[in-house]
């Protein structure tokens, strides 16, 4: 009932305001329907490039196993980027995806059952890339998206067992800038990945208490891209 009264009062006030405005215009409201402002729309762009990453990797464990990060340098990606105009008006949007070869892992204070390892994986990153072009040679970028992957190898001498989760997926985001010298572009980005899939099945160490394990990575990236447009 109170909400209904509020709605009625609001509609009444809006009606009074409209009436006052209309009366101030001599009973007629003239609306200019012309739109003379020119909107400059940038053409679509297609980029193909390679990216190298230096990554600071680790795993978040619960309960805490005092895991320490492992830094990796064998990380490479092949990427396709498509920049487009949203509704033919805003030229700030793009989509990027590709294939990545990467390594990540951890060491721990306890090293229970020789769990310390560095994993090798193949991934498919997919992000929405927001961009802002400044002049002819500079572009700022913001990445928001995710990734999926599969762990193909491990440094653990025992290899994978039934408690190791080999499929992976998670969130991916970051930002950076690009230096443009058409048709080539140099991209510099800092990205963060957080896996939403466990590294291990929760019962890997015990059926009495579960172990949760989430890999995460902070990467520093440089890429060389070719602009086809």
For the regions a protein language model found, what residue spans apply to each?
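Residues that define the transmembrane beta-barrel architecture of outer-membrane proteins
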Residues: 42-46, 70-76, 118-124, 138, ...
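Transmembrane beta-barrel strands of outer-membrane/channel proteins
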Residues: 50-56, 97-103, 142-150, 177, ...
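Short glycine/proline- and aromatic-enriched beta-strand/turn motifs that initiate or cap beta-hairpins
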Residues: 24-83, 225-229
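Gram-negative (and chloroplast) outer-membrane scaffold detector with strong preference
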Residues: 78-155, 226
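Short loop/turn motifs that connect adjacent beta-strands in outer-membrane beta-barrel proteins
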Residues: 36-45, 85-93, 133-139, 180-185, ...
């Amino acid at each position: 009932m109170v909400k209904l009264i509020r709605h009625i009062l609001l509609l009444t006030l809006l009606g009074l305001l409209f009436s006052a405005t209309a009366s101030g215009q001599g009973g007629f409201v003239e609306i200019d329907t012309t739109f003379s402002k020119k909107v400059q729309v940038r053409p679509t762009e297609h980029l193909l490039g390679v990216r190298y990453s230096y990554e600071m990797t680790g795993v978040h464990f619960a309960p805490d196993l005092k895991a320490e990060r492992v830094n990796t340098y064998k990380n490479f990606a092949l990427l396709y980027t498509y920049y487009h105009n949203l509704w033919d008006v805003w030229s700030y949007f793009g989509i990027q995806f590709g294939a990545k070869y990467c390594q990540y892992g951890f060491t721990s204070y306890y090293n229970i059952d020789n769990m310390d390892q560095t994993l090798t994986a193949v991934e498919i990153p997919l992000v929405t890339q927001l961009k802002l072009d400044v002049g002819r040679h500079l572009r700022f970028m913001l990445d928001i998206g995710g990734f999926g992957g599969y762990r193909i190898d491990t440094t653990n001498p025992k290899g994978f067992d039934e408690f190791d989760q080999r499929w992976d997926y998670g969130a991916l985001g970051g930002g950076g800038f690009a230096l443009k010298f058409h048709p080539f572009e140099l991209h510099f980005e800092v990205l963060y990945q957080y896996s939403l899939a466990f590294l291990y099945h929760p019962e890997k160490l015990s059926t009495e208490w579960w172990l949760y394990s989430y890999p995460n990575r902070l990467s520093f990236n440089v890429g060389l891209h070719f602009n086809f447009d």
